[in-house]
């Protein structure tokens, strides 16, 4: 079975680029690598980081420069015609998914969309700054053969007639062989995210200010397009000036894992997510998560992987109490690693992926045309 995907940042993660960032793209790398290890033929199209026609294979995943001489959709069409995949894969809300899915269906390629945020499936909330592009994106969801969800709560956001094609695809994090015991850790609370309004860095600052004896390590660069000038300047000034905040700016992926693995707690102040990949990174490192709101499928509460606090006051109390109890953190860390190993391993994700594919393939019928031989390599037809 062959699957294709287009994403330059996935290539960045695969090559160890320290500038790579984005939970969706990091997951895209883990998933494509896991599928390749399971015997899938996986090709990731790269628009800019590789020259057109240049190839590189990393951990079984083939990266191919596809160029973008005119418009992405033309590159997509050429890519699908040349590769002849069984499936194409797409992540995150994007107006291009509508026409991209339609092109794939026309060529007889099955379509899999993977949601990476709850808002991806809430059409009245998604793409709030580009509302006029919601319709083509919604068309892409309609034309998707499979919609992968991160947690079961996301299924409820879909219209009832789309819910039957929604399948849970668990996040992936390869467990490190060893972790640092909590009694040997650095006694820090780590907060790691791209700094944008939905991550609520203002709440992080308030919590840190009210816990002056606890050290916070903060990683992440601001996403300036999401902010007005005044608020982000104030946020950054406070992050750099509070004496108990160690602000690191953008942190390379491998260094971020080390910081999380050395910390006593991971703090989430976000008010909207899907299933944060950084939760898996924390749990895999044996670091409990203290989350103000986010708790997909109630995993933190039900499995003892940290604490869900609901209020700033509750967060302050949870951080204060857990920082004083290394044995309790150690117990939570053991449960966290066990949970990741059982539910979020590459093997578990591939099993879920293939179950969904098999269910759809049994009832699937092809689109208008299946890779006409006469057109496949004809530049005149492109």
Residue spans of the language-model regions?
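Conserved donor-binding/catalytic core segment of Leloir-type glycosyltransferases
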Residues: 4, 181-199, 205-211, 217-219
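Aromatic "clamp/platform" in nucleotide-sugar-dependent glycosyltransferases that forms part
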Residues: 93, 271
């Amino acid at each position: 079975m062959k699957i294709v995907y287009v994403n330059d940042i996935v290539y960045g993660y695969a090559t160890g680029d320290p500038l790579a960032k984005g939970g969706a793209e990091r997951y895209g790398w883990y998933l494509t690598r896991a599928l390749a290890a399971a015997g899938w033929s996986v090709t990731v199209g790269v628009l800019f980081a590789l020259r057109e026609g240049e190839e590189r294979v990393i951990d079984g995943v083939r990266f191919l420069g596809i160029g973008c001489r005119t418009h992405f959709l033309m590159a997509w069409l050429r890519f699908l015609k040349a590769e002849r995949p069984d499936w194409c894969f797409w992540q995150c809300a994007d107006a291009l998914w509508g026409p991209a899915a339609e092109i794939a269906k026309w060529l007889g390629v099955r379509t899999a969309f993977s949601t990476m945020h709850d808002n991806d499936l809430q059409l009245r909330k998604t793409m709030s700054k580009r509302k006029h592009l919601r319709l083509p994106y919604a068309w892409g969801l309609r034309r998707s053969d499979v919609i992968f969800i991160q947690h079961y709560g996301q299924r409820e956001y879909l219209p009832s007639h789309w819910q039957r094609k929604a399948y849970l695809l668990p996040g992936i994090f390869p467990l490190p062989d060893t972790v640092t015991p909590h009694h040997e850790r650095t006694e820090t609370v780590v907060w790691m995210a791209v700094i944008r309004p939905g991550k609520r860095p203002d709440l992080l600052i308030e919590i840190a200010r009210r816990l002056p004896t606890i050290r916070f390590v903060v990683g992440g660069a601001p996403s300036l397009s999401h902010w007005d000038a005044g608020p982000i300047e104030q946020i950054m000034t406070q992050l750099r000036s509070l004496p108990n905040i160690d602000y690191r700016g953008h942190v390379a992926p491998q260094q971020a894992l080390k910081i999380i693995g050395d910390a006593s707690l991971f703090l989430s102040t976000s008010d909207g997510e899907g299933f944060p990949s950084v939760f898996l990174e924390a749990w895999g490192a044996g670091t409990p998560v203290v989350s103000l709101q986010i708790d997909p499928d109630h995993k933190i509460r039900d499995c003892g992987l940290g604490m869900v606090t609901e209020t700033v006051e509750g967060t302050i109390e949870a951080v204060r109490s857990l920082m004083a109890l290394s044995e309790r953190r150690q117990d939570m860390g053991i449960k966290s690693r066990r949970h990741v190993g059982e539910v979020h391993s590459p093997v578990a994700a591939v099993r879920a992926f293939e179950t969904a594919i098999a269910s759809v393939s049994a009832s699937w019928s092809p689109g208008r045309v299946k890779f006409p031989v006469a057109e496949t390599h004809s530049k005149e037809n492109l």
